[in-house]
């Protein structure tokens, strides 16, 4: 016989769809206090995207510690997409202009990209595996607000877009490449149509 959660249990939980990681201190503080968001228990089973600021992603030892901790805890789904940006806060400013939560929007952005198989986009599980085997080159989508170079978001039409890709090689960040270069790499890996 099957049992489910009663209404009170669901009301007492928070289900984040986006995890922002800005730096090691921020990550440790969030993770050490992750069990509760206000008065709600946090359940990461619905997490769609882990968004890591590029300045943190470039710190090999700190990223290694973060991945090790996430893998050991097993609370964040392995199939959560990994993306990077210059500023998580700047992207968060766009959420009010979106028809959905930022995490859902970013997931849809990946899954609806024409001509690219969604298996091309790195997940936490792929980063865990690459940490161990150092065989693949992954391309982590770099998200920015298209048409904006810096400052606050002012134009209602500006939404987050994939503007480049961070190359992840031998378990560490190796620099940005443009979308055409990444698409060519996806094509050679059979993840893109010609």
Model segments located where?
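Membrane-proximal alpha-helical signals and transmembrane carboxylates
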Residues: 1-194
């Amino acid at each position: 016989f099957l049992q489910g959660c009663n209404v009170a249990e669901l009301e007492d939980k928070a289900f984040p769809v986006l995890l922002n990681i800005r730096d090691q201190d921020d990550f440790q503080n969030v993770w050490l206090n992750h069990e509760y968001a206000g008065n709600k228990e946090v359940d990461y089973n619905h997490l769609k995207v882990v968004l890591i600021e590029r300045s943190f992603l470039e710190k090999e030892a700190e990223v290694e510690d973060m991945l090790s901790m996430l893998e050991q805890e097993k609370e964040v789904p392995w199939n959560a997409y990994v993306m990077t940006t210059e500023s998580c806060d700047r992207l968060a400013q766009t959420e009010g202009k979106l028809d959905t939560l930022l995490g859902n929007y970013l997931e849809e952005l990946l899954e609806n990209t024409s001509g690219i198989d969604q298996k091309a986009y790195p997940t936490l599980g792929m980063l865990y595996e690459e940490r161990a085997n150092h065989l693949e080159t992954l391309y982590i989508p770099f998200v920015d607000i298209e048409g904006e170079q810096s400052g606050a978001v002012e134009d209602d039409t500006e939404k987050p877009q994939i503007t480049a890709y961070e190359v992840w090689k031998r378990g560490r960040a190796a620099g940005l490449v443009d979308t055409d270069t990444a698409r060519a790499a996806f094509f050679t890996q059979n993840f893109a149509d010609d």
